[in-house]
Amino acid sequence: MGKHILLLPLGLSLLMSSLLALQCFRCTSFDSTGFCHVGRQKCQTYPDEICAWVVVTTRDGKFVYGNQSCAECNATTVEHGSLIVSTNCCSATPFCNMVHR
């Protein structure tokens, strides 16, 4: 009986973590239209993660690369040589990292 009592908190913990987890899109490489060419999947966030997507463009606005994931995320825009790398984060709704271009 003692084992059954110990399983209850574990079960509740797993239930709560699954309820708090956020579903996001995962894509290793998407194009300028947002179409995923490599690794189209869904992911579920772990604690401290949210939905994220990264877009790399040239200084004159030409699309170079994009990806989506579940990740620890800080929204930033960084210039690196002739490229601009924009990291975007969201957690408001499931699959909020859908890319519309």
From Swiss-Prot:
CDD domains: TFP_LU_ECD_UP. GO terms for biological process: negative regulation of activation of membrane attack complex. Residues 22-99 form the UPAR/Ly6 domain. It comes from the Eukaryota. One of its GO terms (cellular component) is extracellular region. It is found in: Secreted. Keywords: Disulfide bond, Glycoprotein, Secreted, Signal. Residues 1-21 form the signal peptide. InterPro entries: LY6_UPA_recep-like. This is Urinary protein 2.
